Amino acid sequence: MAFLALGINHKTASVDVRERVAFTPEQLVDALQQLCRLTASREAAILSTCNRSELYIEQDHIAADAVLQWLADYHQLSLDELRASAYIHEEHDAVRHMMRVASGLDSLVLGEPQILGQMKSAYAVAREAGTVGPLLGRLFQATFSAAKQVRTDTAIGENPVSVAFAAVSLAKQIFSDLGRSQALLIGAGETITLVARHLHEQGVRRIVVANRTLERASILAEQFGAHAVLLADIPQELANSDIVISSTASQLPILGKGAVESALKQRRHKPIFMVDIAVPRDIEPQVGELDDVYLYTVDDLHEVVAENLKSRQGAAQAAEELVSAGADDFMVRLRELAAVDVLKAYRQQSERLRDEELQKALRLLGNGGNPEDVLMQLARGLTNKLLHAPSVQLKKLSAEGRLDALAMAQELFALHEGSTDKTPQ
């Protein structure tokens, strides 16, 4: 058994690369099954967010190159291009990395809680695809436990900070009084929900939620006294919007340069603040070329995030220690698990030998044999059979000069020098 964690994130790859390596929800099940089939991976899961795409894999033997090649082929990238941004963690490091990710220690926003939910979704999809078995399943459960402990035992989650919070903080820097501003939110997922909550708390005058389905938009809008519209209504709403924040799972841009130019004319070139949190991007990069548009992507939020994270830095060290301890504990339990199959096979073999000798003894008793003699024969026969295979192997090891193996056998059988009693002849 061997664990592998491989991927790219906001620290190793630009948004251009990240959006090319991202998986859509519709792709995941097929991608997982293909990954296992083509890379000799027994178990696999994929985590794909705006800031990272990672593969978590269990194999007989580490085959990172094959997995990296598959990822490049799947997204039609050159291997060299992908390798330049990719990182690979194996065994204990892979376990620790998963736990750090789920705990928010590897996030753009230190300690952000959304990543744990995304990790749980990755696990659920892998179960749906049939690519999670007992080993990777145990690792996910240990990862969730470690992340929960980090949340419970440290202050990493205090002073709520997220990409959504960073986007709203940036809006406050541009519009000193958000109470006079109108906001258009595109999407209705977890990130946009957080954005809506922060904007509502800041007293934004009007919030509009645009989504592919009106039902989903309405559910979110009702929570914050907002208005719900369809994506097709965005051009009409854009002209009235001072703040536009977008985060959808669309594979194609939702806002183009032409639509924004038209809105600016209607606004008489009153500035629009835009944040594109999506990967792939929802807003065409060319929109940023317009004079009256302030367009930011997730990569532009680093400075804002850094300013709001100082209060969490002290808790990070304690969280790292908890994660390291969790990874160590998991690896110990995993090594213990490796002995289970051996013990199970040994017990089955011993029980088979016992049953054979017991049946022989019962036949002798049925034929009128002396009970004491039969019991002695049963004990002697069972002892000889149980010791036969170990005796043969120990003699072989001795003949080969395998003193280390002999010492291990002595420890295995709890034998100590001089402890053997001499049996009377």
From Swiss-Prot:
It catalyses: (S)-4-amino-5-oxopentanoate + tRNA(Glu) + NADP(+) = L-glutamyl-tRNA(Glu) + NADPH + H(+). One of its GO terms (biological process) is protoporphyrinogen IX biosynthetic process from glutamate. Catalyzes the NADPH-dependent reduction of glutamyl-tRNA(Glu) to glutamate 1-semialdehyde (GSA). Possesses an unusual extended V-shaped dimeric structure with each monomer consisting of three distinct domains arranged along a curved 'spinal' alpha-helix. The N-terminal catalytic domain specifically recognizes the glutamate moiety of the substrate. The second domain is the NADPH-binding domain, and the third C-terminal domain is responsible for dimerization. Pathway: Porphyrin-containing compound metabolism; protoporphyrin-IX biosynthesis; 5-aminolevulinate from L-glutamyl-tRNA(Glu): step 1/2. The keyword Oxidoreductase applies. During catalysis, the active site Cys acts as a nucleophile attacking the alpha-carbonyl group of tRNA-bound glutamate with the formation of a thioester intermediate between enzyme and glutamate, and the concomitant release of tRNA(Glu). The thioester intermediate is finally reduced by direct hydride transfer from NADPH, to form the product GSA. InterPro entries: 4pyrrol_synth_GluRdtase, 4pyrrol_synth_GluRdtase_dimer, 4pyrrol_synth_GluRdtase_N, GluRdtase_CS, GluRdtase_dimer_dom_sf, GluRdtase_N_sf, NAD(P)-bd_dom_sf, Shikm_DH/Glu-tRNA_Rdtase. Belongs to the glutamyl-tRNA reductase family. PROSITE patterns: GLUTR. Its EC number is 1.2.1.70. Disulfide bonds: none annotated. It comes from Pseudomonas entomophila (strain L48). Pfam families: GlutR_dimer, GlutR_N, Shikimate_DH. NCBIfam families: hemA (TIGR01035). Gene3D superfamilies: Glutamyl-tRNA reductase, N-terminal domain, NAD(P)-binding Rossmann-like Domain. SUPFAM superfamilies: Glutamyl tRNA-reductase catalytic, N-terminal domain, Glutamyl tRNA-reductase dimerization domain, NAD(P)-binding Rossmann-fold domains. GO terms for molecular function: glutamyl-tRNA reductase activity; NADP binding. Keywords: NADP, Oxidoreductase, Porphyrin biosynthesis. The active site is at C50 (nucleophile). Substrate binds at T49, C50, N51, R52, S107, E112, P113, Q114, Q118. The record marks H97 as: Important for activity. This is Glutamyl-tRNA reductase. NADP(+) binds at G187, A188, G189, E190, T191, I192. Homodimer.
